[in-house]
């Protein structure tokens, strides 16, 4: 799919479609959240093995990433829980 601008409800709907039951977030609250996004989640013991690359996408938050600039579905997936 081509990159597209997604704002407001369109952005929420796109995240819901991409992430499904995993849920999603817009931007990290603290640096700790970025490093351990699933600490209390179902994958608690596996977090260290997953290749998280959230920092580069979350530095500015998903609104800047996908509303002010066009973004891809691959980028949206970085905001799934």
From Swiss-Prot:
User: What CDD domains does this protein map onto?
Assistant: IlGF_insulin_like
Q: Which GO terms describe its biological process?
A: glucose metabolic process
The pro-peptide lies at: 33-58
Single GO molecular-function term? hormone activity
Q: Which UniProt keywords apply?
A: Carbohydrate metabolism, Disulfide bond, Glucose metabolism, Hormone, Secreted
The record's GO CC annotations read: extracellular space
Q: What InterPro entries has UniProt attached to this entry?
A: Insulin, Insulin-like, Insulin-like_sf, Insulin_CS, Insulin_family
Q: Which SMART domains does the entry link to? A: IlGF
User: Quick check: keyword Aminoacyl-tRNA synthetase in the entry?
Assistant: no
Which subcellular locations apply to this protein? Secreted
**A family per Pfam:** Insulin
Which residues are connected by disulfide bridges in this protein? 7-67, 19-80, 66-71
Q: What is the documented function of this protein? A: Insulin decreases blood glucose concentration. It increases cell permeability to monosaccharides, amino acids and fatty acids. It accelerates glycolysis, the pentose phosphate cycle, and glycogen synthesis in liver.
Q: What's this protein's family per the entry?
A: Belongs to the insulin family.
User: What does the subunit comment say?
Assistant: Heterodimer of a B chain and an A chain linked by two disulfide bonds.
Q: What is this protein called?
A: Insulin
What organism is recorded for this protein?
Answer: Anas platyrhynchos
């Amino acid at each position: 799919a081509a990159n597209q601008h997604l704002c407001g409800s369109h952005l929420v709907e796109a995240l819901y479609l991409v992430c499904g039951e995993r849920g999603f977030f817009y931007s990290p609250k603290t640096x700790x959240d970025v490093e351990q996004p699933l600490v209390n989640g179902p994958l608690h013991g596996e977090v260290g093995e997953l290749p998280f690359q959230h920092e580069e996408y979350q530095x500015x938050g998903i609104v800047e990433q996908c509303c002010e600039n066009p973004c891809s579905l691959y980028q949206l997936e970085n905001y799934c829980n």
